[in-house]
Amino acid sequence: MRGLVCAICLSLLCSSVAFAAPKKETPKKGNPNDQAVLDFDAPFVDDSNTKADGDITDWGNYKLTEFSTLMSGEYDYDWTGPKDLSGAVSVMYGAEKIYFYIKVKDNAVVSKKKRWKSDKVELWLMPEDENGKALGGLRGLQLDLGPMVDGGAISAKWLSGKQSGATAVGFIGDGGYDIEVSVNYDALGKTPVMNGAMRYCVLVRDWDQDDANEDEAAIGSCPINPKNPKSIKREKMGKVSLNLKDAMWQYILDVDKRHSLAPDKRLSAAKEPWQIEVTDIGGTPTPDLVAFSGDTLVIAGYGLGNDQLAWFSLSLESPGSGAPAKIDILDINGDKKPEIRITRDEHCTNNPMTANRSYLFRFENNATHYLASYINEIRMDNGDGVMKNTYTFTKQATIQKLDPKSSKEMGGCQLNGSSDMFEFLMPSDGEKSRTLPHI
């Protein structure tokens, strides 16, 4: 009987002990701030030989940069690993377009026709200049995989603004899909191609469609918020550095070296550093280069004569003093045609004096045309005196004036190649101004 009582007590004791169930872990959610910014020093390519056509052999020599950080959705539920969803991107740029290759691993590429929503990729872009100033607003290009899943072509659509300036081609393969995209700079604002940058971000939106309660999983190449991608700050976007200015000039030097007969006549043999200005001479979408060194002027650009890079060189008859010249691009007479002004010092051949001389050129009808030259001032090399002239250019005439403070004791200055130069007004001439023909 005693044993029975003890057994009953033990049974009651055991029934009163409760074991706590293990706490269910909350799935980790995607966080845009976990993603690093991916920058590129993109290679330059020839637009005439590069197209968004689905032929990815163009990208064979260029590295893809991978990204797989979850921006939205839950790990282990909406995203199970890189094979479920991960991405990679590469960038090239040409004179008129920028190119993106986007490669996505996705174990289920879906269309909204099947059930809920299509898989999509968004490419967000904003150009900026060399000082980091925006050259246009933020634009998003939506690439819808749905039509491609259903047997058609990928749909490329700007999320705002005009629907032009972008081309996309994609194909679905084993374990994912590939997309080639080309975007014209003029679809984004002013071109940054010479020495600026393209800010970019790739956002990949994924739906597996195996659960009605699933959330969208999204990954990105920058810390972008999938719920409000337009809120991305420019400094948080990836930066593609562009430098067509240097690429153009190096190409010109390389070609000139191969074709120049005399080594000392090559552009690369210039004794003085090349001064290079970026400007618009030919009125084409891509800016041009104006370069000067010693006595040689070079004008280069795409669309100057044909669609390829072309350049034109011209040598002055007189040598400079060795001091750096100044390049100005201006419309001197208001006719809306840009002139090129080269200003430099030249030594007088008859007296120990130095003249500051300007040369005017215009590029027109696929040729560089010399317009005129004139002396701005003449200085005694010992600093004892100076004479100055000023010039005002209008559509009707050129007005030349003598600075009243000019030294009266100085003699004239003879320069090489001065036969077609405006005659300098001397204090001894007795004239204070002259009216000359217009340029």
PLM regions: where:
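Acidic/hydrophobic-patterned starts of short beta strands in beta-sheet-rich repeat architectures
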Residues: 280-293, 332-346, 392-406
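Acidic, small-residue rich beta-repeat scaffolds with periodic aromatic anchors
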Residues: 22-29, 244-267, 348-439
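Hydrophobic residues embedded in beta-strands of well-ordered beta-sheets
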Residues: 98, 121, 152-154, 175-179, ...
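Bacterial N-terminal signal peptides
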Residues: 7-15
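Repeated scaffold domains used in trafficking and secretory/extracellular systems
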Residues: 273-276, 321-329, 380-388
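Positively charged n-region of N-terminal signal peptides that target proteins for export
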Residues: 1-5
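Structural preference for beta-rich elements and adjacent junctions enriched in aromatics
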Residues: 21-261
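Terminal domain-start segments
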Residues: 244-319, 425-439
